[in-house]
A protein has these predicted regions:
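Sequence-level preference for short, compositionally simple segments enriched
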Residues: 1-167
Length: 167
């Protein structure tokens, strides 16, 4: 949000602008708050890219991510502090967006998954998380290095996020 345009300011001179508070000045106090935030703004996804260097012919990467406007970058930094992992990057396609993401498998396995096991997501996001956990279990036992494992991962992946079919 870049505020009111000059034209709007000219036509509505009596409008008082309310300053937006800076989000993220405090740490995350309650794990349920973080879970609720992820329910609304986060996502779990799996990338499987063709790569001949792998015995299965695919490289599998798991990512937990939250995207926000750049003004909320300080808030995303608090997620790194709270979870003890992740990184912040500017979105390559939109300069006003920053992404918090965790893609290192050990951090997903040891920090992200246990956090959401102890503080459950709700609704559709929970279903995506459960599929994400299934993929993690396949990767953990090196199933992603086999054609059968890749097929299972691709099947799970094809039903996650916006590709999920609702009954």
């Amino acid at each position: 949000n870049k505020g009111l345009s000059d034209t709007l300011k000219l036509h509505f001179p009596d409008i008082l602008l309310f300053p937006r508070p800076v989000v993220g000045e405090q740490g995350i106090q309650d794990p349920s708050w973080l879970t609720g935030f992820v329910d609304g703004e986060g996502f779990f996804y799996v990338k499987s890219l063709k790569n001949k260097r792998y015995s299965s012919g695919f490289n599998v990467t798991m990512v937990f991510s939250i995207s926000q406007h750049v003004r909320d970058e300080a808030l995303l930094t608090k997620f790194i502090d709270y979870l003890g992992c992740g990184r912040i990057e500017r979105a390559s396609t939109r300069p006003d967006i920053v992404n918090f993401s965790v893609s290192k498998f050990s951090n997903i396995k040891e920090k992200v998954i246990p956090f959401f096991q102890s503080c459950s997501l709700h609704g559709i996001k929970h279903m995506d998380y459960l599929d994400f956990v299934k993929v993690a279990k396949i990767v953990e036992v090196k199933g992603h290095l086999t054609p059968e494992g890749i097929n299972k991962i691709n099947s799970l992946k094809s039903g996650m996020n916006s590709s999920r079919i609702y009954n």
